[in-house]
């Protein structure tokens, strides 16, 4: 099953999602757009098991990292008809 991992610009660079991921899908990448100077990225989405632990670990009010599971991806992004 294919999962989509999306990182939003509300990321504060706290690394909570990276530490929560059991399959090391996420990593931190340099980014000047936040105070921490880094942002989460998802270079290995093919390893995502869809557990959504990254979402649970995110401390921001609007989750900075979201995992969309299979058909959820098109529905959540407004692509389903």
Curated annotation (Swiss-Prot):
Which positions in this protein are listed as binding [4Fe-4S] cluster 1? 11, 14, 17, 58
**Disulfide bonds, paired cysteine numbers:** none
Identify one Gene Ontology CC term for this UniProt entry: chloroplast thylakoid membrane
Q: Which residues form the 4Fe-4S ferredoxin-type domain?
A: 2-31, 39-68
User: Which GO-annotated molecular functions does the record name?
Assistant: 4 iron, 4 sulfur cluster binding; electron transfer activity; metal ion binding; oxidoreductase activity
Q: Which reaction does it catalyse?
A: reduced [plastocyanin] + hnu + oxidized [2Fe-2S]-[ferredoxin] = oxidized [plastocyanin] + reduced [2Fe-2S]-[ferredoxin]
Listed GO biological process terms: photosynthetic electron transport in photosystem I
Q: Which UniProt keywords apply?
A: 4Fe-4S, Chloroplast, Electron transport, Iron, Iron-sulfur, Membrane, Metal-binding, Oxidoreductase, Photosynthesis, Photosystem I, Plastid, Repeat, Thylakoid, Transport
Copy out the cofactor comment: Binds 2 [4Fe-4S] clusters. Cluster 2 is most probably the spectroscopically characterized electron acceptor FA and cluster 1 is most probably FB.
Cell location: Plastid, Chloroplast thylakoid membrane
Q: How does it sit in the membrane?
A: Peripheral membrane protein
> How does this chain assemble?
The eukaryotic PSI reaction center is composed of at least 11 subunits.
Under what name is this protein listed?
A: Photosystem I iron-sulfur center
Q: Which organism is it from?
A: Tupiella akineta (Green alga)
